[in-house]
């Protein structure tokens, strides 16, 4: 009897036994077609055996056409992911094979890679960066001020790998970034890279997967999930904007795509480039401990000056009611527009206002299913929860005390800033970019095209606009609320605020004219602003690392979170307490249980347990043993978050 254990791309499934027919020759990693629950699926040959304990064994139907297979390197990555992030093999296989490629054959278009490329001349600083990268196999961080030409450096590195016939993966935190990168790529290399994201159709994904497996696809640009594409000849992984939180997946499998990419590079013997003007503290730590190497660019491309940073003390501003732009900022915008230059107004808050409340009884409009305020969206005339998507109408009277004309809104969102800008600058062409206003890559591309062609005078945006866009005529950036996010209790609040302000400021003055950035703040003495103002990220990183070390928090320790959720708060809390009580004794620190910052989400109450351990401690082994000591009832969902980025 010949048995193959087949790994199917089905959540929470382990490899299943199937019988191999006499005429079928199989190797580990081969892709096969099998019957599973009244359907035919593509599976991976995970293991070969001569016997099975299963009572009924189905027979493998066939091998996938063209003898396609998953490399041993990708299989090793699946095993590592399952072990490190404590997730089921089937769930991870679903990332590698997100669709069934065993259906009728599809013609695969081969990328026509030229043997020459039109690449611009690098500066001496950039040439030195390429040389340093080539001389070591360590992951290399290209750290440079915004506009220093980091993309051009990794384009030159990509060219070297394409000349060797290798496959290349370019990872972006948001696929919204891809249009400008794609256009620049086509200009340099003469062919269009493959895009891998959630908007790609099933038919396209099937074609792309087959193209990758057959080595006909050479370059892919994608977000998190592109990391798991089954390359056979992967030579280079570029992780652009490596600091970005979007690389961490916070649903289904909880994993960090940046960190996993480093591991994939080890398995595939692929070289790694990380790029950022504001690297993560983890990456800075890895450089200081000599795990990564550093390339620093101190000059903008063509030696363009960095923008001036001006901090506006909002405690000294006397703003009219429902106004959020200071006189200093308004005057600066007027001058900028008179000079035919573009303006970016940044506020990392969607909608019109973050809170509606009753002045009579104090009632706050919160989500029925979450512990979150409902955000007013004037454009759609709705109150919306940005966590679960619940919407309701805008009330004319208070539903609690029934009083009329007592409802008021607090604080601005970008829709409110748009309204104010339209009143102040009625002749200007104003556009808004956020997840609400640009829901598709095509819409984002349209807005970017309008900005590049000077069809927009004032662009108002959320965090989406901070991610690497290049607008040569944009010379003024106004940050409406520079305090937003810096005063909460999150471990990484200071780091995120510094990165965000530095990144958004970097959109200004990328052409021939010097830029200026205005930060509006009610706490102008915040030390973060002083680092941003002088561009001293090294001192910021040093100070932040000292704070983390004193608190024994990452990157100086390991952390994991257990998130328990369910519809009965008392039952979930009881289970959480029981879990903590039976924790095996070890050299770990256990905090909690405590309500999660988002204590209710989509109708479920949430409690969190945080575990802190030494970097050499086997946290996964400890958690596996710990959780085996208790049976979790079906009404309680438990998630394990290894290396949590947030504690919401």
UniProtKB/Swiss-Prot annotation:
Cofactor(s) this protein requires: Zn(2+)
Protein's UniProt keywords contain Isomerase: yes
Chain positions recorded as Zn(2+) 2 binding sites: 367, 370, 385, 388
Residues involved in Zn(2+) 1 binding: 358, 361, 398, 401
GO CC entries: primosome complex
Gene Ontology molecular-function annotations: 3'-5' DNA helicase activity; ATP binding; ATP hydrolysis activity; DNA binding; zinc ion binding
UniProt short sequence motif DEAH box, positions renumbered to this chain: 240-243
Catalytic activity: Couples ATP hydrolysis with the unwinding of duplex DNA by translocating in the 3'-5' direction; ATP + H2O = ADP + phosphate + H(+)
Domain Helicase ATP-binding: 131-297
EC number: 5.6.2.4
Keywords: ATP-binding, DNA replication, DNA-binding, Helicase, Hydrolase, Isomerase, Metal-binding, Nucleotide-binding, Primosome, Zinc
A Gene Ontology BP annotation from the UniProt entry: DNA recombination
Residue ranges of domain Helicase C-terminal in the record: 393-548
Purpose of the protein: Initiates the restart of stalled replication forks, which reloads the replicative helicase on sites other than the origin of replication. Recognizes and binds to abandoned replication forks and remodels them to uncover a helicase loading site. Promotes assembly of the primosome at these replication forks.
Family of the protein in this entry: Belongs to the helicase family. PriA subfamily.
The protein, known as: Replication restart protein PriA
Lineage: Bacteria, Pseudomonadati, Pseudomonadota, Alphaproteobacteria, Rickettsiales
Encoding gene (name): priA
